[in-house]
């Protein structure tokens, strides 16, 4: 591995590890999309406890689970494709290298593909855990009785939100794996492309969390919803 490759890989690892702490810092200072959605989903679960018929909640959860399942299935196909090249022997690697990848030693090409595979595998594990938690939340919604005491409603709503929020956070982490896998794939065309790709992905993710129209809309919704939620 050359020095530019090593530096670009170090930058990739730095961006991967720094994204979470930076997101937490943004949440404390000015808010982030993921942090604001925690409040929105908590408000949803609180509203769910006041509904006698919870068909709409079940339908929304079912749609969310289907979305996570689609991403997980696509992720699995991508893993199979990359693993097929990586473990397919020298002929598969040489055939892949001949279609436009930067000419490099076989071991370095394997390292580049392994990085893509690692990002996808991490994303798949996040999607699987997300789907499991969403199923737990769906079961809780289905089992929720008609409650008349406000304290009981608050307790049930908090419990449901405590299941749903980590589930959707894991889903977000899985989607993030796609972005970093795309940046890792840029390494196939050279170390400079890896550096550009990971910086571009990092900046795009931060912008979407902090300054995108969706982030601003959700932040405005949080300001409306939060005063009506029970104090913790």
Model feature map: region roles:
Residues 142-161, 165-166, 208-232:
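Cytosolic/matrix-facing juxtamembrane and C-terminal tails of multi-pass cellular membrane proteins
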Residues 57-84, 113, 166-195:
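Transmembrane alpha-helical segments and their cytosolic interface motifs
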Residues 1-10, 100-116, 191-196:
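Hydrophobic alpha-helical transmembrane segments
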Residues 5-33, 71-81, 113-135, 178-179:
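Hydrophobic alpha-helical membrane-embedded segments
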Residues 32-49, 135-161:
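Juxtamembrane inter-helical linkers in multi-pass membrane proteins
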Residues 18, 200-212:
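Alpha-helical transmembrane segments and their membrane-interface exit regions
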Residues 24-64:
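Membrane-interface amphipathic/juxtamembrane segments adjacent to transmembrane helices
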Residues 76-102, 187-195, 201-206:
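Juxtamembrane "helix exit" motif at the C-terminal ends of alpha-helical transmembrane segments
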């Amino acid at each position: 591995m050359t020095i530019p490759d090593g530096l670009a890989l170090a930058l990739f690892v730095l961006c991967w590890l720094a994204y979470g702490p930076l997101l937490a810092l943004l949440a404390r200072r000015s808010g982030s999309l993921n942090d604001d959605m925690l409040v929105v989903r908590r408000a949803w679960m609180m509203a769910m406890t006041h509904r006698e018929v919870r068909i709409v909640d079940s339908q929304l959860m079912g749609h969310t689970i289907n979305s996570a399942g689609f991403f997980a299935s696509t992720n699995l196909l991508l893993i199979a494709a990359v693993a097929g090249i990586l473990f397919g022997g020298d002929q598969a690697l040489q055939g892949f290298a001949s279609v436009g990848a930067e000419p490099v030693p076989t071991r370095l090409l394997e390292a580049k593909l392994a990085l893509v595979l690692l990002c996808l595998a991490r994303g798949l594990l996040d999607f699987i855990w997300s789907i499991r938690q969403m199923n737990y939340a769906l079961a809780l919604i289905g089992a929720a009785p008609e409650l008349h005491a406000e304290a009981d409603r608050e307790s049930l709503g908090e419990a449901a939100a405590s299941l749903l929020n980590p589930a959707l956070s894991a889903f977000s982490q899985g989607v993030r794996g796609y972005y970093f896998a795309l940046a890792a794939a840029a390494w196939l065309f050279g170390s400079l492309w890896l550096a550009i790709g990971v910086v571009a992905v990092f900046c795009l993710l931060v912008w979407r969390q902090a300054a995108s129209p969706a982030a601003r809309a959700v932040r405005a919704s949080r300001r409306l919803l939060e005063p009506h939620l029970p104090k913790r």
